[in-house]
Amino acid sequence: LGTEFPLIQGGMANIATGEFAAAVSNAGALGLIGAGGMNADTLRENIRRCKALTDKPFGVNIMLMNPAAPEMAKVVVEEGVKVVTTGAGVPSQYVPAWKEAGIKVFPVVAATALVRRLAPLGVDGFIAEGTESGGHVGELTTMALVPQVKAMTDLPVIAAGGIASGRQLAAAFALGAC
């Protein structure tokens, strides 16, 4: 993804603004704009603010249950966003246009059933998000979910939720996360 460190900041709604994402990207990780509490115009403004503050890679997290998700799906293409993560839904209808635009697509998954459904669409990897992550409804912990997802795919698997120390990071890597 072109970052200095193998870290992706969570796409936290109402917290991860363009400024926040730019600061994370400037520090060497992949900053994400959390579009969950935004409309399409607000997302566009945040993308432009982020671009003004960094020349480093950044992305956008789109919560697919947001009524503005169809418009946001177009905004990320129009604004040249390079990475999109998705949550709260299945991005099937958006993946072809995103891939055509050269966007890397990483859906958040809380169960292996979603991996089976999304892998054939040509996504670039999966974010295996366990119960330790805020606001999500999966039934598995991150450390239980990551090896299950990795066993189903050769695509990159990113561990999310409850990783707050070097030991936890090392455990995620040992279980197959990248």
How would you label these PLM feature ranges?
Residues L1-P156:
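Active-site entrance/lid segments in N-terminal catalytic domains of soluble metabolic enzymes
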Residues T141-C178:
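Catalytic alpha/beta core domains of metabolic enzymes, predominantly
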